[in-house]
From Swiss-Prot:
[2Fe-2S] cluster binds at C139, C141, C174, C177. Belongs to the NifU family. It comes from Azospirillum brasilense. It comes from the Bacteria. Transmembrane segments: none annotated. One of its GO terms (molecular function) is 2 iron, 2 sulfur cluster binding. May be involved in the formation or repair of [Fe-S] clusters present in iron-sulfur proteins. PANTHER family: IRON-SULFUR CLUSTER ASSEMBLY ENZYME NIFU HOMOLOG (PTHR10093). Its cofactor is [2Fe-2S] cluster. The gene is nifU. This is Nitrogen fixation protein NifU.
Length: 310
């Protein structure tokens, strides 16, 4: 389990500025629900003074993304001018504001930082420069392109494949894009004159309790894992859900597997989780567990969305 600071927990249990913002002046949207993580950032600009007077968010993702990072981002930009927000709020600023994050969750802060320029471009009536060109999609599982990887590497001084995965999610599922990620990483390091992992130790992420360099991921093989049979795949799904159930049961809820349809896994939340405001976060927790267990991207959906007659 990851160790979170008290400030992260505070934003998780008492998120600020969640929900739609009527008559927002600037709106930025990044990510995709299909890929498991999406964020809509909405802001109002003070007509009398050059600063943001309000900011709200709507998001779909894991618990730290839903409540902590997005909530913290809105708190950080309220009161700042458009230019101040654009120039002073990076993903590292978000992580430091929260007192540090586990390396594995830095991707949530990166998405927050990606939404900000999108919202400001919308406010200025400008089209956000789209540096995604055809053929540049690197990680199909999470929809991560080369441009996003390049920005994450440059801003955060990343030097290894594992760090890129922590900060962007790229390569965190089927692993077939690892070689392409390393090509992008090496190109950025060569362009900036930075040293790679063979010449220097990796940078230390924002500090957090219980983290040491030895806790980083071991390098995974580049080849794709062996294909599972249908029975093996079903068993892994069942075992992963059973492994997740105790965490949900501690809060008075439960989850049960209903059906499997290719990449779509249908589950039913019961008890306290049924109709809970955090049910989307619970579903994403189950999804993350299944992606990790299967080594492929899958979508976890509520049983109510199961096609009629299935």
């Amino acid at each position: 389990m990851w160790n979170y600071t008290d400030k992260v927990k505070e934003h998780f249990f008492n998120p600020k500025n969640a929900g739609a913002l009527d008559e927002a002046d600037d709106v930025g949207e990044v990510g995709s629900i299909t890929c498991g993580d999406a964020l809509k950032l909405m802001m109002k600009v003070n007509p009398d003074q050059p600063g943001h007077r309000d900011a709200n968010f709507q998001t779909f993702g894991c618990g730290s993304a839903i409540a902590s990072l997005r909530s913290a981002l809105t708190e950080m930009i309220i009161g700042k001018t458009v230019d101040e927000a654009l120039g002073q709020v990076t993903n590292r600023d978000i992580a430091e504001y929260l007192g540090g994050l586990p390396p594995e969750k830095m991707d949530c802060s990166v998405m927050g930082a990606e939404a900000l320029p999108a919202a400001i471009a919308n406010f200025k009536g400008e089209g956000l420069v789209d540096d995604h060109e055809e053929g540049e999609l690197v990680c199909k599982c999470f929809g991560i392109d080369a441009a996003m990887i390049e920005r994450a590497v440059t801003v955060n001084s990343l030097t290894t494949l594992e760090e890129v995965t922590h900060y962007t999610k790229a390569g965190g599922s089927c692993q077939t894009c690892h070689e392409k990620i390393e090509e992008v990483l090496e190109a950025v390091l060569a362009k900036t004159g930075a040293v790679g992992p063979a010449q220097a130790p990796s940078p230390t992420p924002p500090a957090r309790s219980g983290w040491t360099p030895s806790s980083r991921w071991p390098r995974r093989p580049r080849h794709a894992p062996a294909k599972l049979t249908n029975v093996q795949r079903m068993q892994k799904i069942m075992f992963a859900i059973e492994d997740w159930r105790p965490q949900i049961q501690r809060d008075g809820g439960d989850v049960e597997l209903v059906d499997i349809d290719g990449k779509d896994i249908y589950v039913r939340l019961t008890g306290a989780c049924s109709g809970c405001s955090q049910s989307a976060g619970t579903m994403m927790g189950v999804q993350a567990k299944l992606v990790e267990a299967l080594g492929e991207f899958v979508r976890v959906k509520p049983a109510s969305l199961l096609p009629v007659g299935a």
